Amino acid sequence: MSRRSEAPKRQILPDPKYKSDLLAKFINTVMKDGKKSVAERVLYGALTQIEGKKGDGIQVLEQALDNVRPRVEVKSRRVGGATYQVPVEVRPVRQNALAMRWIVDAARKRGEKSMALKLAGELMDAADSKGSAVKKREDTHRMAEANKAFSHYRW
């Protein structure tokens, strides 16, 4: 373990269009190679697509995140030469980060034409509790449930 103190959390600026911290975080998750304006265009395009089909885009985004957030995950723990998958609860900040990452990863694997359409599709699916990101969460929960016997190895 490092003896250095934990780095202070930097304050994230809200996004310029909706003034939302959540959207700013999501834009940063979508961003590749530091191209923030491209990531903004993708996310705002996805929200516009959602508003055309389902109504309020931000509400759909929040519902999607809520449906994808994992409550528990497994961490590897080595005990006497054997490695156990130990279920641990996920902190709220990490829950959000994982949910965003899983949604973006699932969207990138979809077949639609543009990234905005892929992201819109994945967000709408996640809001309806279906799609790859929700499946990933279910798999994570299933793994934790299967390894419940090793929960006493928690640290």
UniProtKB/Swiss-Prot annotation:
A GO molecular function held by the record: tRNA binding
Family matches, as PROSITE patterns: RIBOSOMAL_S7
An example Gene Ontology biological process: translation
Keywords: Ribonucleoprotein, Ribosomal protein, RNA-binding, rRNA-binding, tRNA-binding
GO cellular component terms given for this protein: small ribosomal subunit
NCBIfam families: rpsG_bact (TIGR01029)
Known function: One of the primary rRNA binding proteins, it binds directly to 16S rRNA where it nucleates assembly of the head domain of the 30S subunit. Is located at the subunit interface close to the decoding center, probably blocks exit of the E-site tRNA.
Protein name: Small ribosomal subunit protein uS7
Organism: Thioalkalivibrio sulfidiphilus (strain HL-EbGR7)
